[in-house]
Amino acid sequence: MKLLNCQIDNERFIGLLDNNRTINLSKALKVYSTIYRGEDWFFNSIEDLLSLDNPEFCLKKVADFIERYNLKESLYVESFKTLSPIIRPSKIIALGRNYTEHARETGYNPPEEPIFF
């Protein structure tokens, strides 16, 4: 199962790749949650989905729901922007002088161990 963070206009949603097409998983989650009121699965990013204690359970339930009610065609999206898999990273790690030519450009010898900052 491959997930994407996607956007159409200003609306973000989770996309689910299905045979070279993309299902609007966020929309499927909203429909599922509306019908089965015990679940509040209103997620617009992969990070939000992963905040669940058991995201695999959620994905399985919704995938079964989509199949059972033959909803794929109504959930496919055609034209959208693919966003970063992590929309709000908690930290960013960079690697300094990570190749010989770059180290020499900056006037340094290549490091023996990676320089992270």
Give the location of each predicted region.
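N-terminal non-catalytic cap/leader segment that marks the start of a structured domain
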Residues: 1-114
